Regions:
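Catalytic strand-loop segment that frames the active site of acyl-thioester-processing enzymes
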Residues: 1-40
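Short capping/connector residues at structural and topological boundaries
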Residues: 28, 34-35, 39, 44, ...
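Hydrophobic beta-strand-centered segment that forms part of the acyl-chain substrate-binding groove
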Residues: 53-92, 117, 124
Length: 131
């Protein structure tokens, strides 16, 4: 099964995207992180931002199913609060600069309600998928 950490894209514009992830107690990562107090690993919240940003990166690409985004760099990553079962993650990404030569730079913010839980600036490259 693919590791999908976005349930739905709820809005997409020229330079931004908004996604949603309903965090349930059935997520595999909760088994060991932590059994007594389940917390979604922060790196998986960053991954959810990345997956949402991938939709923005590929939205204007012809035949997007033939391409992937691979992350090159993360900067200014801040973990502000924990994410627990029952939370709904709102994932917002905004282009920092126009996409050039397949390089995408975005600022992402993950929210639970109105509270910021993770922030990051990320850079990715768009590459043709090898078949």
């Amino acid at each position: 099964f693919p590791m999908l950490l976005v349930d739905k894209i709820i809005e997409i514009g020229d330079d931004y995207v908004v996604g949603l992830k309903n965090v349930t107690g059935n997520e595999d990562f909760f088994n060991g992180h932590f059994p007594e107090e389940p917390v979604m690993p922060g790196v998986l919240v960053v991954e959810a931002l990345g997956q949402t940003g991938g939709m923005l990166a590929l939205k204007d690409v012809e035949d997007p199913e033939e391409y992937s985004t691979y992350f090159m760099k993360f900067e200014e990553v801040k973990f502000r609060d924990k994410v627990v079962p029952g939370d709904t993650l709102l994932l917002k990404l905004q282009l920092v600069e126009p996409i050039r030569r397949g390089i995408v730079k975005m600022r992402g913010t993950a929210y639970v309600g109105s509270k910021v839980v993770v922030e990051a600036v990320m850079m990715a490259m768009i590459t043709k998928t090898k078949k």
